[in-house]
Amino acid sequence: MIDRSLTRRTLARQAAYAAASMTLLGASPVLAQAPGKAGTKVLRYVFPVAETGFDPARIVDLYSRIVTAHIFESLYTYDHLARPVKIRPALAQGMPEHSEDYRTWTVKVRPGILFQDDPAFGGQPREVTAQDFVYALKRFADPANKSPVVAGVLEQKYIGLAALREKALKEKKPFDYDTEIEGIRALDRHTIQFRLEEPRPRFGDSLAAHDLFGAVAREVVEKYGDAIPAHPVGTGPFRLVQWRRSSLIVLERNPTYRDVRYEAEPASDDAQGQALLARFKGRRLPMIDRVEISIIEETQPRWLAFLNAQIDFVNVPGEFVNQAMPNGRVAPNLAKAGIQGYRALNPDSAFTYFNMDDPVVGGYTPEKVALRRAIGLAMDVEREIRVIRRGQAVPAQSMVVPHTSGYDPAFKSENGDYDPARAQALLDLHGYVDRNGDGWRERPDGKPLVLEVATQPDQTSRQFDELWKTNMARVGIRVSFSIGKWPEQLKAARAGKLMLWTLGSSAAGSDGQSSLARLYGPQAGSQNLARFKHPEFDRIYQRMNVIPDGPERDELFRQAKLIVTAFMPYKVTVHRFNNDLVHPWLVGYRRPLFWQEWWHMVDIDNTRRPAK
């Protein structure tokens, strides 16, 4: 349970933790709380951004997907300890079989897997069947669900799925779930077959995503209707028992979860992985009973919650990294308290997108391209890393992220340059000049040039806002800010209502092409927030889909990066380090590389938790 306040005695007991921070400021953060049973193993956790809901077909944000990844299960998953990553069966019985041309994929579903109990099942156990996966995939194509990832699903080219969606749109009738399509079929109760219009050599990897592509029971969706985001019913290790929007999320052990044991295949030279396997091998999962998640958007209260042992785990906010993990090592005062730290370069990127449909920064004409390039050249990424991120990032050269195919650490591009003089020359050359002597540039047609930057009301965002003003003032560009909560900004971004916005993205798999989906024309309004449309880029992207990994595909990655650098629909700034701290009573933690689920793989030792 997370307390709303701390007694004087508790504050004194936690002074050892607080000593490594700046000060406690005499108060602890106000957190949500939920009733729990004594002796229950509870993982207490914090999200820095509010969730949006728990219907896999309707979400795209990271934090909602972290929750759904622990409730639903897909056909495949990732080995928790294997590095390089390895896919293994989850609800599938064995690995997928595929045709020689990679167009037909067949999967056996394990018999006897049960959904968690729910009133929708009329008090009877409900076994997962192949049809549940057929239904779940079709839901992404249903226009009524307004799925933010529908373009990505259709990109797999399931035969007949796009036509079924178009039929519903054209006739303005409910989506026809009962019509069988060739692309996604249940051959029998426990066999599902996927048939694709084009080869997809890496299709099997797409089936390893608990957060989005788990089994969904049709009767549950039909029972709850529009309230389905609050009623996730899956087969995973946990079930949702309480949800106060943007405040508290509580999961508990799923009592119908099957007998799953801790198994993994760490590399022989992976000392940490081998130690975890030796400690937990054969333990029944999940090892904990309950997960309590509070939402704390401000970094200082989030950090204090960890120091005061109100939460068990924290991704250290940037402004506290140097106190918590100087030189990448846990600070002595924290280490003395048994706190452990983990640092790793994430398979992610932070970037600013430009709305290509916006009349100020969008467009493909030379002056609009020059404006975006100039803005990118004026962005002092090294200062961002040094001052705001406290050194916890590396400069990015392209959208493709570390640890994925297509990432080349030797690749360099203008995307990684900081050159205000070149930025000013570009602006001067293309007519963005100060016509009235007020110190600010106007557009070539004489209208004011003002960048409207979408941002959030938290402390870290305010630091980025100040850097925006400083960077742009240096080249004579005025900036204003549109402030809103992160979920609101995401909704506006997908609708094409923002001029530009800075956010981040993490890879969900080892194929670097997923990062390039943010530039693929048909993904506009979905992953492609910039609404970038470029025929040659789309051709390259489509070719990458159908060929195996190898030299040809590597060359296509290079060409795609050059196109993005030339047109600058995104300014990719950094790849970030994660710095995680865990209290000594949270045991078995290891940050996943691409996947979201890990709560079932850790244990809580209540004997080491401080008494209240």
Indicate where each model-derived feature is located:
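N-terminal lobe/hinge region of extracytoplasmic solute-binding protein
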Residues: 46-100, 233
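Short N-terminal segments immediately surrounding and downstream of signal-peptide cleavage
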Residues: 35-48
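Extracytoplasmic/periplasmic ligand-capture domains
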Residues: 3-7, 33-37, 80-81, 96, ...
